[in-house]
Amino acid sequence: MEACPHIRYAFQNDKLLLQQASVGRLTLVNKTTILLRPMKTTTVDLGLYARPPEGHGLMLWGSTSRPVTSHVGIIDPGYTGELRLILQNQRRYNSTLRPSELKIHLAAFRYATPQMEEDKGPINHPQYPGDVGLDVSLPKDLALFPHQTVSVTLTVPPPSIPHHRPTIFGRSGLAMQGILVKPCRWRRGGVDVSLTNFSDQTVFLNKYRRFCQLVYLHKHHLTSFYSPHSDAGVLGPRSLFRWASCAFEEVPGLAMGDSGLSEALEGRQGRGFGSSGQ
């Protein structure tokens, strides 16, 4: 029997409760009130540091019954900084997350990266070596007005990898500007990428700008059947995300770069929220 891969983590935050760190998923719950102002990005410092096992990436997302949308973050293996959750208020007035109304989830997934000698249309090599996702650039100039949702159509079929499914995720840099991308599958016939501007400013995105990322999730992680090890809050109810079976191992020195993390210090380090370009 194969040993269960380990996710190493360190956590210390008086405003969050570590509710669960079982096989597959770590969950935090807010202990204090979080105020989200209209048309303003809210970031929640988690006091959480994590490193995935080899061949895995990490996914970070939030869930709540309140009118609040969370950026689904892809945490690259080379990222060594503190994890932070990006939230957007759906309403045009204040929203309040009272204690226990926000759950923050961290889970691992297996992935692969296609071998590309050169960029293929809008699909580009990532900014940092070893990143989970490929960069995807805009095929045209784009303007997003406050609280507007637009779709960008990509017709070029992505490179194929056996047993893996190309999936679109947003970028932390754009999420910090108030632009959230709805994660979705990129199928052979193309994909319509949905972007929503939650800010109070009209945002102009130039042609060829990196606006989302393409991640090849192992097919095991995509299912249409609910189980205790899946979540509909990532990709939606028609394609649930099922996380990898990993054990969480607490390593208090992780935040200081201990435990064999020196190999990552020359790469991404703490740049971005786990996505390149922030």
Swiss-Prot record:
Substrate binds at R171, S172, G173, F273, G274. Its cofactor is Mg(2+). GO terms for molecular function: dUTP diphosphatase activity; metal ion binding. Pfam families: dUTPase. It comes from Epstein-Barr virus (strain AG876) (HHV-4). The keyword Magnesium applies. It comes from the Viruses. InterPro entries: dUTPase-like, dUTPase-like_sf, dUTPase_trimeric, HSV_DUT. SUPFAM superfamilies: dUTPase-like. GO terms for biological process: dUTP metabolic process. The keyword Acetylation does not apply. Its EC number is 3.6.1.23. CDD domains: trimeric_dUTPase. Involved in nucleotide metabolism: produces dUMP, the immediate precursor of thymidine nucleotides and decreases the intracellular concentration of dUTP to avoid uracil incorporation into viral DNA. This is Deoxyuridine 5'-triphosphate nucleotidohydrolase. Keywords: Hydrolase, Magnesium, Metal-binding, Nucleotide metabolism. Belongs to the dUTPase family. It catalyses: dUTP + H2O = dUMP + diphosphate + H(+). It is an enzyme of class 3 (hydrolase).
